[in-house]
Amino acid sequence: MINLTDSAVNAIKSAISSSERRAGGLRVMIEAGGCNGFKYKMGIADEPKPDDTVIDCDGLKVFVDSKSREHLAGTTIDFVLAPESSGFTFHNPNAATNCSCGKSFG
């Protein structure tokens, strides 16, 4: 389904531990928008919704809704530290096109 690199898991666990809200895991989803039709969204979530798939990545729970599941199948999420720009990257084998920003696909 979805894979997270060690770097991504560590960055997310760090964000969750410094968050003031209760966190049951990470929600990963897509929504219409961006340059190429879809954009990625991630956020801390309290708990999974009834139709979510729950994936365990090294102790981190990842929640994926049924609408996003097919589009995200096989995606690897990484966290890259770079002097100019640090952040999450998505390597999605289902994307026919990708925006240069890396946050949108079609």
Curated annotation (Swiss-Prot):
GO molecular function: 2 iron, 2 sulfur cluster binding
InterPro entries named among the record's database cross-references: Fe-S_cluster_asmbl/transfer, FeS_biogenesis, FeS_cluster_insertion, FeS_cluster_insertion_CS, HesB-like_dom_sf
Source superkingdom: Bacteria
Similarity-based family: Belongs to the HesB/IscA family.
Residues in the signal sequence: none
Swiss-Prot/TrEMBL GO biological process terms: iron-sulfur cluster assembly
Lineage: Bacteria, Pseudomonadati, Pseudomonadota, Alphaproteobacteria, Hyphomicrobiales
Cellular component GO terms, alphabetical: cytoplasm; cytosol
Protein name per UniProt: Uncharacterized protein blr1755
Gene3D superfamilies: HesB-like domain
Pfam families from the UniProt entry: Fe-S_biosyn
Originating species: Bradyrhizobium diazoefficiens (strain JCM 10833 / BCRC 13528 / IAM 13628 / NBRC 14792 / USDA 110)
